[in-house]
């Protein structure tokens, strides 16, 4: 089996305005890996995520789970790649949470019985059963985030791509979400400004700026390089700094 979940070679992409968003991106992500994608606003992080399931298609080669992101493969890729948007309301558009979660299985061609079984299981897993009949508009941001993740995980994808998953969450909601993501065994790509989240969850860090990958390496090496991070408008995680101070003073 190919050990690479994602293989990207020479990827360039520009929006209709002509502004380049990705420039000569080369990236391999191994199966089972949790990769943190960091960078300032406009670095190209979200644009790169949207290439993983063919929402955007630039020049170059993108292979996901052994398939090129060409039209012939897009249905299968989108079934096996789950993308969680920064704003959960982009994924919650039906009258109730239960209907939103059921939308994917029913449109994937599964029987009503199989879809119901999967929906019930994922609602229970994320503690959404008590609010299953509730409109997404009446939920807190944390509940909306969990519901949006449920709409993705009900399809049992092999690769998960998160765009700013902690945005808008209060401390308790953020902690709950981190623990949910930590428990997931799938290959994960997390685009975020939340340095603490990246430090907690990701074993490998990629830094992007101006559409290019400017650094790629083990978590501690990248997040420990204050000069590198400062050059790209990022900061070291405070918990990492405090841990080093504690060890130094011990």
Name each model feature, range by range.
Residues 38-40:
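The feature captures the beta-strand-to-loop junction immediately N-terminal to the Walker
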Residues 224-250:
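ABC ATPase nucleotide-binding domains
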Residues 53:
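Helix-to-loop junction immediately C-terminal to a conserved catalytic motif
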Residues 192-193:
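H-loop/switch region of ABC-family ATPase nucleotide-binding domains
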Residues 135-139, 143:
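Conserved ABC ATPase signature
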Residues 60-69, 77:
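Conserved ABC transporter NBD signature motif
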């Amino acid at each position: 089996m190919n050990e690479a979940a994602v293989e990207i070679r020479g990827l360039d992409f520009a929006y209709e305005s002509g502004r380049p968003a990705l420039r000569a991106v080369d990236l391999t992500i191994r199966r089972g890996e949790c990769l943190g994608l960091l960078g300032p606003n406009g670095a190209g992080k979200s644009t790169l995520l949207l290439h993983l399931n063919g929402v955007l298609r630039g020049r170059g080669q993108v292979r996901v789970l052994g398939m090129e992101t060409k039209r012939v493969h897009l249905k299968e890729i989108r079934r096996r790649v789950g993308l969680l948007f920064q704003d959960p309301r982009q994924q919650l558009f039906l009258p109730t949470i239960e209907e939103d979660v059921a939308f994917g299985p029913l449109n994937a061609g599964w029987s009503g019985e199989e879809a119901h079984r999967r929906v019930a299981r994922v609602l229970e897993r994320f503690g959404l059963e008590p609010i299953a009949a509730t409109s997404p508009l009446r939920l807190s941001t944390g509940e909306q985030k969990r519901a949006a993740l449920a709409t993705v995980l009900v399809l049992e994808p092999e690769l998960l791509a998160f765009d700013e998953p902690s945005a808008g969450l209060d401390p308790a909601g953020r902690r709950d979400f981190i623990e949910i993501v930590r428990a997931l065994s799938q290959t994960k790509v997390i685009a975020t400004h939340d340095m603490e989240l990246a430090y907690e969850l990701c074993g490998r860090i990629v830094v992007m700026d101006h559409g290019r990958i400017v650094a790629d390496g083990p978590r501690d090496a990248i997040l420990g390089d204050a000069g590198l991070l400062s050059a790209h408008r990022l900061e070291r995680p405070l918990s990492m700094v405090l841990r080093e101070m504690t060890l130094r003073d011990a």
